[in-house]
Amino acid sequence: VGATPLEMREDRHFLCSRHEFAVHARGRKQLRMEYFYREMRRRHRVLMDGDQPMGGAWNYDADNREAFGPNGPGFLPATPRFEPDVITQGVIELVETRFAAHPGSVASFGWPVKRAQALQVLHSFIDERLEHFGRWQDAMWQGEPWLYHAHISAALNLKLLNPREVIEAAEAAFRTGRAPLPAVEGFIRQILGWREYVRGIYWQQMPDYAQR
């Protein structure tokens, strides 16, 4: 039997290719996410006003470190949850059988497993929680594990959502007055900054990086 040719292609669910990250890192004594993030903002024209960042600052992290008062966060919109279908239920049973000793639980699994469900979760975040995400993105409150977060990491990594559409949805919320700039910038920084940067570091410096 003849060999089957294998073609390796770039993952289209990241906006920075491995080559582009290597070019960014070339010649730098130290890698900083902030500088990479600014480069990505310029390249993809995200939250830009001409050649300058929207609002005059690249990073609004200083505005995004508030704590809840003594009464806590107050009303929190519910995040969409989904009843497992036949396929998902089968996978849950498989996990419970083969990986019973692993940490975690699938007893209350309700995450999106279809694109339409993932879009529903994204739109719920944009419409109901994004405006408050920035101020309290680092805050914690006992008994409230989700607060104003988006719950889309799994959907992104499973390719049910594309990072570009997530970023565009958040930026549109700012430009139409539905969410303030610090909240939108803080959220976009997680997607266009940290997610892309950590992936770039992984491909460039692993496995040695894990031992530092």
Task: Report each predicted region and the residues it spans.
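Catalytic cores of enzymes that engage adenine nucleotides and/or redox cofactors via long glycine-rich
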Residues: 64-212
